[in-house]
């Protein structure tokens, strides 16, 4: 898996769940 994608996943989860 590309490191860039690994970095994007937590950000997407943060935006969706509003838990940062």
UniProtKB/Swiss-Prot annotation:
Expression (tissue specificity): Expressed by the skin glands.
Subcellular location: Secreted
UniProt-listed GO biological process terms: defense response to bacterium; defense response to fungus; killing of cells of another organism
Pfam family, any one: Antimicrobial_1
SS bonds (residue pairs): 14-20
Regions that span the bilayer: none
Principal place of residence: secreted
Domain of life: Eukaryota
Methionine sulfoxide modified-residue sites: 8
UniProt keyword list: Amphibian defense peptide, Antibiotic, Antimicrobial, Cytolysis, Disulfide bond, Fungicide, Hemolysis, Oxidation, Secreted
UniProt key word Disulfide bond: yes
GO CC term, one of those recorded: extracellular region
Family under the similarity heading: Belongs to the frog skin active peptide (FSAP) family. Brevinin subfamily.
Entry function: Antimicrobial peptide active against Gram-positive bacterium S.epidermidis ATCC 12228 (MIC=4 uM), against Gram-negative bacterium E.coli ATCC 25922 (MIC=64 uM) and against yeast C.parapsilosis ATCC 22019 (MIC=16 uM). Has hemolytic and cytotoxic activity.
Protein name in UniProt: Brevinin-1ITa
């Amino acid at each position: 898996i590309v490191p860039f994608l690994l970095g994007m996943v937590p950000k997407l989860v943060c935006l969706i769940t509003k838990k940062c």
